Structures are given as C-alpha cells and as structure tokens.
A protein has these predicted regions:
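Extended catalytic-interface subdomain
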Residues: 183-194
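RNA-binding accessory domains that recognize and position tRNA/RNA substrates
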Residues: 1-182, 198-270
Length: 270
C-alpha cells in the first residue's frame, strides 16, 4: 500500500510512501531554500526513519579537509585559481590554512568582471590571508580572442582554454631549482560537474552548459588538480567559508560566472 503524504494545487502527488517496503519519495526539492520545512523533512528521514547518528560537525569537516589538502600537496607547490567568488575564496582560505606559503593565489583579470572587482579581490587576499598573490592582467589577450565571437559555448571554451594557459605560464615563472608547480587548486563544486555532464558523474547527466573550469587542458599544459569542493553544493560551501573565517561579504556575495560579462552579454563583447 502506497500512501500519498503531500499534494499541491497543481500536483496530486507531491510526496508518497510505502512504509512496509521502506520507500519514501518526493516530487519536489526539499533541499532548496524556498522549500518550507525542507530541512526538517530531510532531518526526519535521516535521523528518525534511517536511524543515523548526528555526529557530523563543520569543525570536524574543516580539520579533515585541511589535513587532506596538506597530505595531497606534501612538499610540492600549488597555485590557486582565484576569481574572488565564494567557491574559489573558500578553497583559498582552506589552502592558506593547510599549506600557507606553498600556495600562490593567481587572479586572472580578463577584463570582463564587475566594476571594482579586481581591486576588491586584491584588497581582501593581500591583507587578510598569509599567502602570495599574483594579479595577471590579461585583458588585451582575452579581447583579441573573443573579438567577433557570439556563441556562448564558444566563449566559454575560449575563456577556459586561455585560463589554463595563463595559469601554466605563471606556474613556469614560479619554478624553483627546476622543480615545477605540480598542483592547481580550484573551486569546482558539484553543480558545475552536474551541469557540464562531466567526468565525476560518470558522464550520465545531460550537458546543461559547459563550465570554464572543466574545459580540458590544451596541449602543453599539465597540472594535477585539487578540487576539495567537488562534492559540495553552494549552501554547504557558504557554511564552510564561515567556519574558515571568511568575511560575510565574500561568503554571501551574489554569484557571478567565471567568464563574467562575456556570458551575460548577448552577442560579441567587442
């Protein structure tokens, strides 16, 4: 016997259950912010029905992720692809905690950011974090590559490919005693992977849009990637950012695409 447990004005079955078979389903997203009592619904399912013990804490997660980041990098160097958005900022805070001076934050200015954003990013990450910071002015290079391009997916491909080349150029400059920078850390989160139909979903999801940070490396560019947030959703990333001590104006800032105004503007940006 299946019992309908929730309905709406337009949907006769919003949730249903079969207690005998231990099946509980919803036809909506309880995890999203505008689902009233969604968090309580999930809590009831996990702790009352499944019998899980609530022994997880954000402090424990911070310690675990810091240790994992430190172990991954070892004695090597890492550059952090920093956009100033919440995702890359959280990875920057985590990396600063884990490996400090072994990490260099690299901010690629493609000239398509919000007004005052490059200055704000540099202000925050040179004064609040004990890490090296490099501001790469690549505005002219991007303007030349994007001239006349109107297709959004092509813009993303161009921007993502050029990003890899810019980061690799910085990595080569940072070589010490012939030892290359091995790792590149970036703020890839799970929705990026889902929307791209990318590698970690097993390729079983449809491509909604490609993400510049998931574009394949061009020939001649090679890094080992560190993506500590690749199983996190945005609300979890924000909670982690607060636990790491990031200021609220970074953690709760309005999301903005990595390719910036190139995607917000319809047609060519030249």
């Amino acid at each position: 016997g299946i019992t309908v447990t929730a309905s709406t004005d337009v949907g006769p079955v919003a949730a249903m259950e079969c207690v005998e078979r231990k099946i509980f389903t919803t036809q909506f997203h309880p995890e999203v912010k505008h689902s009233e009592y969604g968090q309580q619904l999930l809590s009831n399912f996990l702790f009352e029905i499944c019998g899980l013990e609530p022994n997880w804490s954000m402090d424990n997660l911070v310690e675990t992720m810091t240790a994992e980041f430190r172990k991954k990098v070892g004695d090597d160097r890492v550059i952090l692809a920093l956009s100033g958005g919440v995702d890359s900022s959280v990875v920057a805070a985590l990396g600063a905690r884990a490996v400090c001076k072994q990490m260099t934050c690299v901010f690629i200015n493609h000239g398509l950011l919000r007004k005052g954003e490059p200055e704000q990013v540099e202000e925050v990450f040179t004064k609040q974090f004990d890490v090296d910071f490099i501001h790469v002015h690549a505005e002219d290079r991007y303007a030349e590559l994007l001239a006349g391009v109107t297709e959004p997916e092509e813009k993303r491909r161009i921007i993502g490919t050029r990003f890899w080349k810019e980061f690799f150029a910085v990595a080569q400059q940072l070589e010490t005693d012939g030892k290359p920078v091995k790792y590149l850390a970036q703020g890839t989160i799970y929705p990026d992977i889902i929307e791209s139909g990318a590698r970690k979903t097993g390729g079983k999801t449809a491509t909604i849009k490609s993400h510049h940070n998931l574009i394949p490396f061009p020939e001649g560019v090679h890094f080992d990637l560190i993506e500590p947030l690749d199983h996190f959703f945005k609300d979890e990333v924000r909670a982690l950012g607060l636990a790491l001590g990031l200021p609220g104006h970074i953690v709760f800032r309005q999301p903005f695409p990595g390719p910036g105004l190139a995607i917000r503007i319809i047609g060519a940006v030249d």
